[in-house]
């Protein structure tokens, strides 16, 4: 099921997806084909768990390859030259002050494909990302969360 939804990526995100695709096509495909071949050598495949496992992994790999190719085909790469430092946009690194806890946090605003909250990479589609996009230094933005509202003051915007 192909989709033509635009996939917003940073250059770093594009490289990561291309590397994953290359690894799946060259290394993982070969490995799983070898495992299938080996499992077939055991004879009867009707009760061959190694064969079933390898075929399931093959299906996953082929599905992921299809997904990655589709994402790359529809990729819109954010050019670092287009990232402004006066307004928050995708590709911005934003230092904010969490006004409730008086803590500074730096977020990297990325497309949803690259989001990784554990690395402070937040999606432009997330509640915090949506609130920050378009903000300027000194702005106070509010994010509605299940427990109420969080306020952030934008301290710094950089590439």
Swiss-Prot record:
InterPro entries: GreA/GreB_C_sf, TF_GreA/GreB_CS, Tscrpt_elong_fac_GreA, Tscrpt_elong_fac_GreA/B, Tscrpt_elong_fac_GreA/B_C, Tscrpt_elong_fac_GreA/B_fam, Tscrpt_elong_fac_GreA/B_N, Tscrpt_elong_fac_GreA/B_N_sf. It comes from the Bacteria. The keyword Glycoprotein does not apply. GO terms for molecular function: DNA binding; RNA polymerase binding. Residues 3-37 form a coiled coil. Keywords: Coiled coil, DNA-binding, Transcription, Transcription regulation. GO terms for biological process: DNA-templated transcription elongation; regulation of DNA-templated transcription elongation. The keyword Lipid metabolism does not apply. HAMAP family: GreA_GreB. Belongs to the GreA/GreB family. Necessary for efficient RNA polymerase transcription elongation past template-encoded arresting sites. The arresting sites in DNA have the property of trapping a certain fraction of elongating RNA polymerases that pass through, resulting in locked ternary complexes. Cleavage of the nascent transcript by cleavage factors such as GreA or GreB allows the resumption of elongation from the new 3'terminus. GreA releases sequences of 2 to 3 nucleotides. This is Transcription elongation factor GreA.
């Amino acid at each position: 099921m192909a989709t033509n939804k635009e996939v917003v990526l940073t250059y770093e995100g594009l490289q990561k997806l291309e590397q994953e695709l290359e690894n799946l096509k060259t290394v993982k495909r070969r490995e799983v084909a070898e495992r299938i071949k080996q499992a077939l050598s055991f004879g009867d495949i009707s009760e061959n768990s190694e064969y079933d496992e390898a075929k399931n992994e093959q299906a996953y790999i082929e599905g992921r390859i299809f997904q990655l190719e589709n994402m790359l085909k529809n990729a819109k790469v954010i050019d670092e030259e287009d990232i402004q430092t006066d307004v928050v946009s995708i590709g911005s690194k934003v230092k904010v002050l969490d006004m409730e806890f008086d803590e500074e946090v730096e977020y990297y605003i990325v497309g949803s494909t690259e989001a990784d909250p554990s690395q402070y990479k937040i999606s432009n589609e997330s509640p915090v990302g949506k609130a920050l996009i378009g903000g300027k230094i000194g702005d106070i933005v509010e994010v509605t969360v299940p427990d109420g509202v969080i306020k952030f003051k934008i301290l710094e915007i950089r590439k």
